[in-house]
Design a protein with these regions (language model features):
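Acidic, Mg2+-coordinating active-site environments of NTP-dependent enzymes
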Residues: 110, 118, 131-138, 154-239, ...
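Active-site-proximal loop/hinge segments that shape catalytic or ion-binding/gating pockets
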Residues: 407
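ATP-dependent carboxylate-amine ligase catalytic core
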Residues: 18, 22, 26-37, 63-152, ...
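C-terminal helical cap/extension that packs against the catalytic core
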Residues: 194-216, 230-234, 299-302, 308, ...
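Short, surface-exposed connector motifs at secondary-structure boundaries
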Residues: 183-191, 321-327, 349-354, 398
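N-terminal leader/targeting and accessory segments in enzymes
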Residues: 1-48, 52-67, 76-78, 93, ...
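Nucleotide phosphate-binding/pyrophosphate-handling subdomain across enzymes
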Residues: 38, 134-137, 145-158, 162-163, ...
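Glycine-rich phosphate-binding loop signature in dinucleotide/nucleotide-binding domains
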Residues: 127-133, 269, 320-325, 393-401
Protein backbone atom coordinates (compact mmCIF):
# COMPACT_ATOMS: atom_id res chain seq x y z
CA UNK A 1 0.00 0.00 0.00
CA UNK A 2 1.30 3.49 -0.81
CA UNK A 3 0.31 6.85 0.72
CA UNK A 4 -2.40 7.60 -1.84
CA UNK A 5 -3.92 4.13 -1.40
CA UNK A 6 -3.88 4.60 2.38
CA UNK A 7 -5.77 7.91 2.08
CA UNK A 8 -8.22 6.40 -0.42
CA UNK A 9 -8.96 3.62 2.06
CA UNK A 10 -9.54 6.10 4.92
CA UNK A 11 -11.81 8.35 2.84
CA UNK A 12 -13.73 5.46 1.24
CA UNK A 13 -15.54 4.76 4.49
CA UNK A 14 -18.52 7.10 4.79
CA UNK A 15 -20.22 8.00 8.06
CA UNK A 16 -23.66 8.56 6.51
CA UNK A 17 -26.12 5.85 7.49
CA UNK A 18 -24.07 4.67 10.47
CA UNK A 19 -25.77 4.70 13.85
CA UNK A 20 -23.84 7.01 16.20
CA UNK A 21 -22.19 5.28 19.15
CA UNK A 22 -18.92 4.14 20.71
CA UNK A 23 -19.22 0.39 20.14
CA UNK A 24 -17.41 0.34 16.78
CA UNK A 25 -14.50 2.42 18.10
CA UNK A 26 -14.17 0.25 21.22
CA UNK A 27 -14.24 -2.94 19.13
CA UNK A 28 -11.64 -1.60 16.70
CA UNK A 29 -9.30 -0.33 19.44
CA UNK A 30 -9.62 -3.61 21.36
CA UNK A 31 -8.53 -5.50 18.22
CA UNK A 32 -5.49 -3.17 18.06
CA UNK A 33 -4.48 -3.73 21.69
CA UNK A 34 -6.26 -0.69 23.21
CA UNK A 35 -3.44 1.82 22.55
CA UNK A 36 -5.48 4.64 24.16
CA UNK A 37 -5.21 2.91 27.55
CA UNK A 38 -1.48 3.80 27.60
CA UNK A 39 -2.14 7.53 27.19
CA UNK A 40 -3.18 10.60 29.19
CA UNK A 41 -5.51 13.17 27.60
CA UNK A 42 -6.92 16.66 27.63
CA UNK A 43 -10.30 16.26 25.91
CA UNK A 44 -11.60 19.36 24.09
CA UNK A 45 -15.21 19.86 22.90
CA UNK A 46 -17.16 22.97 21.86
CA UNK A 47 -18.89 24.67 18.93
CA UNK A 48 -16.18 27.21 18.10
CA UNK A 49 -12.62 27.78 19.24
CA UNK A 50 -11.90 24.15 20.09
CA UNK A 51 -9.18 23.75 17.45
CA UNK A 52 -7.46 27.03 18.41
CA UNK A 53 -7.70 26.18 22.12
CA UNK A 54 -6.32 22.68 21.47
CA UNK A 55 -3.40 24.14 19.48
CA UNK A 56 -2.61 26.57 22.34
CA UNK A 57 -2.73 23.78 24.94
CA UNK A 58 -0.40 21.60 22.87
CA UNK A 59 2.04 24.48 22.25
CA UNK A 60 2.24 25.36 25.97
CA UNK A 61 2.67 21.73 27.09
CA UNK A 62 5.44 21.30 24.52
CA UNK A 63 7.11 24.50 25.79
CA UNK A 64 6.95 22.94 29.29
CA UNK A 65 9.05 20.05 27.98
CA UNK A 66 6.38 17.39 27.44
CA UNK A 67 5.95 15.15 24.41
CA UNK A 68 2.52 16.19 23.19
CA UNK A 69 0.10 14.57 20.77
CA UNK A 70 -2.46 16.77 19.00
CA UNK A 71 -5.54 15.30 17.33
CA UNK A 72 -7.72 17.75 15.35
CA UNK A 73 -10.07 18.03 12.37
CA UNK A 74 -10.54 18.90 9.61
CA UNK A 75 -7.14 19.32 7.95
CA UNK A 76 -6.30 22.50 6.01
CA UNK A 77 -3.57 21.52 3.54
CA UNK A 78 -2.70 17.88 4.19
CA UNK A 79 -4.42 14.97 5.89
CA UNK A 80 -1.40 14.29 8.16
CA UNK A 81 -2.04 17.59 10.01
CA UNK A 82 -4.80 15.82 11.92
CA UNK A 83 -2.30 13.67 13.86
CA UNK A 84 0.74 15.56 15.23
CA UNK A 85 3.39 14.99 17.88
CA UNK A 86 5.31 18.06 19.12
CA UNK A 87 4.12 20.01 16.09
CA UNK A 88 5.32 17.36 13.59
CA UNK A 89 2.71 15.71 11.39
CA UNK A 90 2.61 11.92 11.25
CA UNK A 91 5.07 10.87 8.49
CA UNK A 92 3.56 9.38 5.31
CA UNK A 93 5.31 6.04 5.80
CA UNK A 94 4.04 5.74 9.39
CA UNK A 95 0.50 6.52 8.26
CA UNK A 96 0.69 3.82 5.56
CA UNK A 97 2.09 1.29 8.04
CA UNK A 98 -0.67 2.02 10.57
CA UNK A 99 -3.42 1.87 7.92
CA UNK A 100 -2.08 -1.56 6.94
CA UNK A 101 -2.49 -2.54 10.59
CA UNK A 102 -5.96 -1.01 11.08
CA UNK A 103 -7.51 -2.22 7.81
CA UNK A 104 -7.64 -5.99 8.60
CA UNK A 105 -9.08 -5.25 12.07
CA UNK A 106 -11.72 -2.92 10.58
CA UNK A 107 -12.53 -5.30 7.71
CA UNK A 108 -13.14 -8.12 10.20
CA UNK A 109 -15.91 -6.15 11.94
CA UNK A 110 -19.54 -6.81 11.05
CA UNK A 111 -20.43 -3.15 11.68
CA UNK A 112 -17.78 -1.38 9.56
CA UNK A 113 -16.17 1.62 11.31
CA UNK A 114 -16.66 5.13 9.94
CA UNK A 115 -13.92 7.32 8.48
CA UNK A 116 -13.58 9.33 11.71
CA UNK A 117 -13.45 6.15 13.81
CA UNK A 118 -10.62 4.78 11.66
CA UNK A 119 -8.70 8.08 11.92
CA UNK A 120 -9.21 8.08 15.71
CA UNK A 121 -7.71 4.56 15.88
CA UNK A 122 -4.75 5.68 13.71
CA UNK A 123 -4.16 8.63 16.04
CA UNK A 124 -4.24 6.47 19.17
CA UNK A 125 -1.76 4.01 17.63
CA UNK A 126 0.66 6.79 16.64
CA UNK A 127 0.44 8.61 19.99
CA UNK A 128 1.09 5.34 21.85
CA UNK A 129 3.94 4.35 19.51
CA UNK A 130 5.65 7.74 19.91
CA UNK A 131 5.18 7.55 23.70
CA UNK A 132 3.36 10.86 24.15
CA UNK A 133 3.27 12.18 27.72
CA UNK A 134 -0.14 13.71 27.03
CA UNK A 135 -2.50 14.04 24.05
CA UNK A 136 -4.73 17.05 23.33
CA UNK A 137 -7.75 15.34 21.82
CA UNK A 138 -10.28 17.42 19.89
CA UNK A 139 -13.80 16.04 19.57
CA UNK A 140 -15.06 15.56 16.01
CA UNK A 141 -18.74 16.29 16.57
CA UNK A 142 -20.71 16.69 19.80
CA UNK A 143 -19.14 14.75 22.65
CA UNK A 144 -21.23 11.96 24.16
CA UNK A 145 -21.23 9.72 21.09
CA UNK A 146 -18.06 11.04 19.44
CA UNK A 147 -15.51 8.30 18.86
CA UNK A 148 -12.89 10.20 20.91
CA UNK A 149 -15.12 9.65 23.96
CA UNK A 150 -13.87 6.07 24.42
CA UNK A 151 -11.02 7.36 26.59
CA UNK A 152 -10.78 6.86 30.35
CA UNK A 153 -11.22 9.97 32.54
CA UNK A 154 -8.85 12.62 31.12
CA UNK A 155 -6.49 14.89 33.02
CA UNK A 156 -8.96 17.65 32.13
CA UNK A 157 -12.03 18.08 29.93
CA UNK A 158 -12.33 21.48 28.23
CA UNK A 159 -15.58 22.86 26.79
CA UNK A 160 -15.01 25.91 24.58
CA UNK A 161 -17.57 28.47 23.34
CA UNK A 162 -20.98 26.98 22.53
CA UNK A 163 -23.46 28.07 19.85
CA UNK A 164 -26.03 26.68 17.44
CA UNK A 165 -24.45 24.23 14.99
CA UNK A 166 -25.02 20.61 13.92
CA UNK A 167 -28.59 20.87 15.23
CA UNK A 168 -29.65 17.91 13.08
CA UNK A 169 -27.23 15.63 14.92
CA UNK A 170 -27.17 17.23 18.39
CA UNK A 171 -30.62 18.79 18.85
CA UNK A 172 -32.43 22.10 18.26
CA UNK A 173 -31.62 23.98 21.49
CA UNK A 174 -28.47 25.23 23.22
CA UNK A 175 -29.32 22.91 26.12
CA UNK A 176 -29.30 19.93 23.72
CA UNK A 177 -25.95 21.01 22.28
CA UNK A 178 -24.49 21.58 25.77
CA UNK A 179 -25.75 18.15 26.82
CA UNK A 180 -23.87 16.50 23.91
CA UNK A 181 -20.67 18.45 24.68
CA UNK A 182 -20.99 17.71 28.42
CA UNK A 183 -20.87 14.03 27.46
CA UNK A 184 -17.05 14.28 27.65
CA UNK A 185 -17.25 14.99 31.40
CA UNK A 186 -16.04 11.86 33.22
CA UNK A 187 -16.46 10.90 36.89
CA UNK A 188 -13.95 12.72 39.09
CA UNK A 189 -12.13 14.32 36.17
CA UNK A 190 -11.80 18.14 36.22
CA UNK A 191 -13.70 20.28 33.71
CA UNK A 192 -12.93 23.76 32.41
CA UNK A 193 -15.82 25.57 30.71
CA UNK A 194 -15.65 28.77 28.65
CA UNK A 195 -19.18 29.60 29.85
CA UNK A 196 -21.21 32.70 29.12
CA UNK A 197 -24.41 31.04 27.87
CA UNK A 198 -26.72 30.52 30.89
CA UNK A 199 -28.87 27.84 29.22
CA UNK A 200 -25.77 25.80 28.34
CA UNK A 201 -23.87 26.59 31.55
CA UNK A 202 -26.69 25.10 33.66
CA UNK A 203 -26.46 21.80 31.76
CA UNK A 204 -22.66 21.65 32.11
CA UNK A 205 -22.80 22.51 35.85
CA UNK A 206 -25.48 19.86 36.45
CA UNK A 207 -23.55 17.18 34.55
CA UNK A 208 -20.31 18.03 36.38
CA UNK A 209 -22.09 17.84 39.76
CA UNK A 210 -23.73 14.49 38.92
CA UNK A 211 -20.34 13.05 37.94
CA UNK A 212 -18.43 14.62 40.87
CA UNK A 213 -16.22 16.39 38.34
CA UNK A 214 -14.67 19.62 39.70
CA UNK A 215 -15.82 22.47 37.42
CA UNK A 216 -13.89 25.68 36.73
CA UNK A 217 -15.61 28.34 34.61
CA UNK A 218 -13.14 30.65 32.84
CA UNK A 219 -13.16 34.02 34.62
CA UNK A 220 -13.18 36.37 31.63
CA UNK A 221 -13.50 39.37 33.98
CA UNK A 222 -9.75 38.86 34.57
CA UNK A 223 -8.99 39.24 30.85
CA UNK A 224 -7.79 42.60 29.50
CA UNK A 225 -7.20 42.87 25.76
CA UNK A 226 -4.80 45.62 24.73
CA UNK A 227 -4.50 47.07 21.24
CA UNK A 228 -3.57 44.48 18.63
CA UNK A 229 -1.80 44.94 15.33
CA UNK A 230 -1.79 42.72 12.24
CA UNK A 231 0.98 40.53 13.72
CA UNK A 232 -0.31 39.81 17.21
CA UNK A 233 -2.93 40.68 19.80
CA UNK A 234 -1.63 41.56 23.28
CA UNK A 235 -3.54 40.64 26.44
CA UNK A 236 -3.29 40.17 30.21
CA UNK A 237 -5.02 37.32 32.02
CA UNK A 238 -4.99 36.33 35.66
CA UNK A 239 -1.46 37.51 36.48
CA UNK A 240 0.08 36.76 33.08
CA UNK A 241 0.69 40.16 31.52
CA UNK A 242 1.64 41.42 28.05
CA UNK A 243 1.25 38.12 26.21
CA UNK A 244 1.59 38.64 22.44
CA UNK A 245 -0.60 36.06 20.75
CA UNK A 246 0.12 35.57 17.02
CA UNK A 247 -3.50 34.49 16.35
CA UNK A 248 -5.01 37.91 15.64
CA UNK A 249 -8.77 37.26 15.80
CA UNK A 250 -10.37 39.45 18.49
CA UNK A 251 -11.84 36.27 20.04
CA UNK A 252 -8.48 34.47 20.41
CA UNK A 253 -7.49 35.95 23.80
CA UNK A 254 -10.70 34.39 25.20
CA UNK A 255 -9.62 31.01 23.80
CA UNK A 256 -6.18 31.62 25.33
CA UNK A 257 -7.80 32.38 28.70
CA UNK A 258 -9.57 29.01 28.43
CA UNK A 259 -6.27 27.27 27.68
CA UNK A 260 -4.48 29.05 30.57
CA UNK A 261 -7.26 28.05 32.98
CA UNK A 262 -7.00 24.40 31.88
CA UNK A 263 -3.19 24.43 32.14
CA UNK A 264 -3.43 25.73 35.71
CA UNK A 265 -5.86 22.91 36.53
CA UNK A 266 -3.26 20.48 35.16
CA UNK A 267 -0.59 22.19 37.27
CA UNK A 268 -2.73 21.59 40.37
CA UNK A 269 -2.73 17.89 39.42
CA UNK A 270 1.06 17.70 39.47
CA UNK A 271 1.99 18.64 35.89
CA UNK A 272 5.06 20.89 35.76
CA UNK A 273 3.82 23.85 33.69
CA UNK A 274 5.45 27.13 34.75
CA UNK A 275 3.97 30.45 33.65
CA UNK A 276 7.09 30.96 31.49
CA UNK A 277 6.10 27.88 29.44
CA UNK A 278 2.51 29.13 29.11
CA UNK A 279 3.79 32.48 27.83
CA UNK A 280 6.29 30.86 25.42
CA UNK A 281 3.70 28.38 24.15
CA UNK A 282 1.10 31.06 23.46
CA UNK A 283 3.59 33.42 21.81
CA UNK A 284 4.74 30.76 19.33
CA UNK A 285 1.44 28.98 18.63
CA UNK A 286 0.49 28.45 14.98
CA UNK A 287 -3.03 27.59 13.83
CA UNK A 288 -3.63 28.12 10.09
CA UNK A 289 -6.90 29.23 8.55
CA UNK A 290 -8.30 31.06 11.57
CA UNK A 291 -8.35 34.82 10.89
CA UNK A 292 -4.97 34.28 9.25
CA UNK A 293 -3.26 37.11 7.40
CA UNK A 294 -1.81 35.79 4.14
CA UNK A 295 -0.76 39.27 2.98
CA UNK A 296 -0.33 42.56 4.86
CA UNK A 297 -0.74 44.99 1.98
CA UNK A 298 -3.21 44.92 0.43
CA UNK A 299 -4.76 42.77 3.14
CA UNK A 300 -5.74 39.18 2.26
CA UNK A 301 -7.29 37.26 5.15
CA UNK A 302 -8.24 33.60 5.37
CA UNK A 303 -10.77 32.57 7.99
CA UNK A 304 -12.50 29.27 8.68
CA UNK A 305 -15.66 30.53 10.41
CA UNK A 306 -18.33 28.14 9.20
CA UNK A 307 -21.44 28.82 11.29
CA UNK A 308 -23.34 31.90 12.49
CA UNK A 309 -21.71 31.81 15.95
CA UNK A 310 -18.20 31.76 14.45
CA UNK A 311 -19.11 34.31 11.78
CA UNK A 312 -20.25 36.75 14.47
CA UNK A 313 -16.79 36.50 16.09
CA UNK A 314 -15.05 36.98 12.72
CA UNK A 315 -17.18 40.01 11.84
CA UNK A 316 -16.32 41.57 15.22
CA UNK A 317 -12.61 40.95 14.48
CA UNK A 318 -12.97 42.64 11.07
CA UNK A 319 -14.69 45.65 12.68
CA UNK A 320 -11.98 45.85 15.37
CA UNK A 321 -9.00 45.49 13.01
CA UNK A 322 -10.35 47.35 9.96
CA UNK A 323 -12.86 49.95 11.19
CA UNK A 324 -14.95 51.59 8.47
CA UNK A 325 -13.55 49.44 5.65
CA UNK A 326 -15.53 47.49 3.06
CA UNK A 327 -14.37 44.02 2.06
CA UNK A 328 -14.40 41.84 -0.99
CA UNK A 329 -15.53 38.51 0.46
CA UNK A 330 -14.58 35.25 -1.21
CA UNK A 331 -17.30 33.00 0.15
CA UNK A 332 -18.15 29.31 0.27
CA UNK A 333 -20.81 28.00 2.66
CA UNK A 334 -22.04 24.47 3.35
CA UNK A 335 -25.66 24.06 2.27
CA UNK A 336 -26.63 22.68 5.71
CA UNK A 337 -25.53 25.83 7.58
CA UNK A 338 -27.58 28.89 8.59
CA UNK A 339 -26.88 30.82 5.37
CA UNK A 340 -29.45 33.54 6.19
CA UNK A 341 -27.80 34.58 9.43
CA UNK A 342 -24.26 34.32 8.05
CA UNK A 343 -25.12 36.60 5.11
CA UNK A 344 -26.95 39.05 7.37
CA UNK A 345 -23.73 39.41 9.39
CA UNK A 346 -21.49 39.89 6.34
CA UNK A 347 -23.62 42.17 4.14
CA UNK A 348 -23.00 45.42 6.11
CA UNK A 349 -19.22 44.97 5.65
CA UNK A 350 -19.33 43.83 2.03
CA UNK A 351 -18.45 45.85 -1.03
CA UNK A 352 -18.67 42.76 -3.21
CA UNK A 353 -18.89 38.97 -2.94
CA UNK A 354 -17.22 36.34 -5.11
CA UNK A 355 -18.81 32.94 -4.48
CA UNK A 356 -17.18 29.53 -4.94
CA UNK A 357 -17.99 25.94 -3.96
CA UNK A 358 -15.51 24.12 -1.71
CA UNK A 359 -14.57 20.63 -2.88
CA UNK A 360 -17.14 18.74 -0.83
CA UNK A 361 -20.64 17.52 -1.71
CA UNK A 362 -22.01 19.57 1.22
CA UNK A 363 -20.97 22.90 -0.37
CA UNK A 364 -23.71 25.16 -1.72
CA UNK A 365 -23.23 25.71 -5.50
CA UNK A 366 -21.52 29.05 -6.23
CA UNK A 367 -24.40 30.29 -8.42
CA UNK A 368 -27.02 29.44 -5.75
CA UNK A 369 -25.02 31.30 -3.09
CA UNK A 370 -24.58 34.32 -5.40
CA UNK A 371 -28.35 34.36 -6.04
CA UNK A 372 -29.03 34.32 -2.29
CA UNK A 373 -26.70 37.30 -1.80
CA UNK A 374 -28.30 39.25 -4.67
CA UNK A 375 -31.77 38.51 -3.28
CA UNK A 376 -30.68 40.34 -0.11
CA UNK A 377 -29.40 43.36 -2.05
CA UNK A 378 -25.71 42.41 -2.16
CA UNK A 379 -23.38 42.40 -5.17
CA UNK A 380 -22.16 38.91 -5.99
CA UNK A 381 -20.63 36.97 -8.84
CA UNK A 382 -19.93 33.23 -8.89
CA UNK A 383 -16.58 31.76 -9.96
CA UNK A 384 -16.29 28.32 -11.54
CA UNK A 385 -13.23 27.30 -9.51
CA UNK A 386 -11.57 28.35 -6.26
CA UNK A 387 -8.49 29.46 -8.23
CA UNK A 388 -10.63 31.68 -10.47
CA UNK A 389 -12.45 32.98 -7.39
CA UNK A 390 -9.24 33.98 -5.64
CA UNK A 391 -7.96 35.78 -8.76
CA UNK A 392 -11.28 37.61 -9.20
CA UNK A 393 -11.53 38.62 -5.53
CA UNK A 394 -7.96 39.99 -5.57
CA UNK A 395 -8.68 41.92 -8.80
CA UNK A 396 -11.91 43.40 -7.38
CA UNK A 397 -10.19 44.20 -4.07
CA UNK A 398 -7.51 46.36 -5.68
CA UNK A 399 -5.80 48.12 -2.79
CA UNK A 400 -8.63 47.27 -0.39
CA UNK A 401 -8.98 44.26 1.93
CA UNK A 402 -10.08 40.79 0.78
CA UNK A 403 -11.32 38.10 3.15
CA UNK A 404 -11.90 34.44 2.21
CA UNK A 405 -14.26 32.73 4.63
CA UNK A 406 -17.32 30.52 5.22
CA UNK A 407 -15.72 27.09 5.60
CA UNK A 408 -12.47 25.43 6.66
CA UNK A 409 -12.88 23.01 3.76
CA UNK A 410 -11.56 25.46 1.15
CA UNK A 411 -8.71 26.91 3.22
CA UNK A 412 -5.99 24.75 1.65
CA UNK A 413 -7.19 25.45 -1.90
CA UNK A 414 -7.45 29.20 -1.25
CA UNK A 415 -3.94 29.29 0.22
CA UNK A 416 -2.54 27.37 -2.77
CA UNK A 417 -4.33 29.56 -5.33
CA UNK A 418 -3.23 32.75 -3.55
CA UNK A 419 0.42 31.56 -3.44
CA UNK A 420 0.29 30.71 -7.16
CA UNK A 421 -1.16 34.14 -7.97
CA UNK A 422 1.71 35.83 -6.11
CA UNK A 423 4.60 33.81 -7.56
Amino acid sequence: MNYEEALNYIHAVQWAGHKPGLTRTRTLLAALGNPHKQLKFIHVAGTNGKGSTAAMLASCLQAAGYRVGLYTSPFINRFNERIQVNGQQIPDEALVRLVERVKPAADAMTDIPTEFEIITALGMLWFAETKCDIVVLEVGLGGTLDSTNVIDPPECAVITALGMDHVKELGPTLADIASAKAGIIKPGSPVVSYGGVPEADAVIARTAAERHAPLTVVDLSRLTIEDGDLDAVTFDFDGLNGIRLPLIGSYQPRNAATAITALRVLRSRGWNIPDSAIRAGLEQVRWPGRFELLRHSPVFLLDGSHNAHGMRATVQSLLDRFPGQKFVFLLSIMADKDVDEMLALLLPLAGQFVTVAAHTPRAMPAETLAEQIRARGGRAEPASTIEAGVARAVALGGTGPVCALGTLYFSGDVREAFAKLNQ
